[in-house]
């Protein structure tokens, strides 16, 4: 069975359509866990009628706790071997789960599945993401799957949106959800799962990614991604108890990043943040320090 977790917060205009896209799935062995994070609109009233289907469960927070806490609440009730994420403003095509199950059957060793997306919604918002999505697709087309994508995604994001991802439940249980930036919980999870698990990419537009100005996407920026990257490395180091193995672990990522983005990016992003997070005293660089 697949457990689908949808977090809800003031998306009453979209949530019904999102739920209907789950009900339309050709693969029927699923449960949908909706966690409403104290919406102030009529989201809960929109969701309740769908709970007549016993596969759909609604959980409500009495106060707003944020995305990470909402996901944690959903995971407490999840029974599936796999966890799929579907944001409350996105949609799936009718064969989304079926295609993912086929991938699992063909590659049982994988721990992460992701697929291509169809962007839709506000015209300007769609145009804003189109070029970047096309570049990512070109890169993915040159890669062979299944593969471990940990170092790939630390150089640049290859996972298009949260609603396009499904992860193995056992792998997710080992993942800390203590992201320093709530809006980037998806990125935090991707890094953790990718560290020890192979991924498989489905080159089909199985997720419909809605673009609008109230989306989480518009609360994200490059500096935030970098901060989450480093924090995730430290978290993995602690969870996996890497000890002295941490140095080659971080060194490989540093070398790849220097090669890709240059020395200044390495110093500002990696050295400074590792210094801050680990309390390591490093001599300032007159070349790069502001």
Feature locations, PLM:
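Conserved nucleotide-sugar donor-binding catalytic segment
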Residues: 76, 136-222, 229
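Short aromatic/hydrophobic "clamp" motif used to bind/position activated sugar donors
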Residues: 83
């Amino acid at each position: 069975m697949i457990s689908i977790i949808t977090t809800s917060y003031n998306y009453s205009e979209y949530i019904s359509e999102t739920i209907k896209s789950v009900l339309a799935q050709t693969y029927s062995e699923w449960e949908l866990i909706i966690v409403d994070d104290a919406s102030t609109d009529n989201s809960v009233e929109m969701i309740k009628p769908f709970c007549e289907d016993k596969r759909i469960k609604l959980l409500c927070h009495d106060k707003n706790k944020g995305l990470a806490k909402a996901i944690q609440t959903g995971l407490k009730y999840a029974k599936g071997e796999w966890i799929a994420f579907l944001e409350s403003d996105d949609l799936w095509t009718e064969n989304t789960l079926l295609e993912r199950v086929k991938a699992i059957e063909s590659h049982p060793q994988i721990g992460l599945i992701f697929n291509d997306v169809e962007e839709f919604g506000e015209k300007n918002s769609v145009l804003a993401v189109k070029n970047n999505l096309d570049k990512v697709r070109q890169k993915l087309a040159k890669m062979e799957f299944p593969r471990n994508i940990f170092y790939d995604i630390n150089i640049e994001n290859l996972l298009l949106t949260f609603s396009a991802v499904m992860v193995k439940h056992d792998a997710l249980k080992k993942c800390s959800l203590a992201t320093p930036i709530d809006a980037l919980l998806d990125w935090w999870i991707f890094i953790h799962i990718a560290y020890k698990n192979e991924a498989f990419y489905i080159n089909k537009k199985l997720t419909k990614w809605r673009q609008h100005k109230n989306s989480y996407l518009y609360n994200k920026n490059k500096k935030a991604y970098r901060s989450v990257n480093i924090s995730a490395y430290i978290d993995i180091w602690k969870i996996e108890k890497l000890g002295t193995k941490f140095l080659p672990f971080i060194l490989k990522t540093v070398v790849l990043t220097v090669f890709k983005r240059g020395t200044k990016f390495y110093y500002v992003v990696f050295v400074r943040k590792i210094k801050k997070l680990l309390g390591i005293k490093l001599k300032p660089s007159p070349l790069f320090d502001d």
